[in-house]
Amino acid sequence: MVLDSSASWEPGDETADQSELLPEIARGVPLIKVLGVGGGGSNAVSRMYKDKLPVVEYYALNTDAQHLFRCDVGHRIALGQNLTRGLGSGALPDLGRQAAEESRSEIQQAVEGADMVFLAVGMGGGTGTGAAPVIAQIAKESGALTVAVVSRPFSFEASTRRKNADDGIGKLKDYVDTLITIPNDRLLELNRDNESTFTWEEALKMADSVLHQGIQAIAEVVTIPGEINVDFADVKTILNNAGPAWLAIGRGKGENRAIEAARQATKSPL
């Protein structure tokens, strides 16, 4: 079931999805679609939507209807309505896989026409872990450059969850052009100063935030003109059938901000 909450485009509205822009505005710009799968992925995409790019479409896909309705994104897809009745996957990846298979036609419609599809997934649960490989396969078969940015559970989480994540990542890599895996344990190194007071909720928010930053950064490179021109063809050359990749974050300010950010990125624990 597809739940579309996007508004129609009006002159002067720079926040509309690309599919709603006038043809002369959209021409020559790659169509990028970001799909958040499961609870963690949907949370990450909800964060992205608050700072949405005008030429990117955002989707949340989940088996948990209550969580899905709380997601503030342009498009929402309830996976496996007949199978799960909107009650979630019970942390069972096979149920997540079956839910995605049931909703295959809705997923195909979602990725149709996309030049590039990002998947944001928090691995280890049922929906994200089980559904992501199915969704990635559908996206890649549509002809889109398909990139997955996934998080791996913290080491202190249940062993079953960690095993589910490993199995899911192993399956997902066969259906994407590029797979960026973020080990959540390394996020703690980014927050060493506050490690003793770092709560579980803050840890999860940080994991969602890193998914957000990774996808948003790549999307901005090909949609926002900069001092150094990087077009979609350049990005496709780098990411097409690239396999495993790594994400690093660096920040800088002042006159030498680019150099400072690059140095920080090379030392990033991610």
Where in this protein do the model-derived segments appear?
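Tubulin/FtsZ superfamily GTPase core signature
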Residues: M1-L270
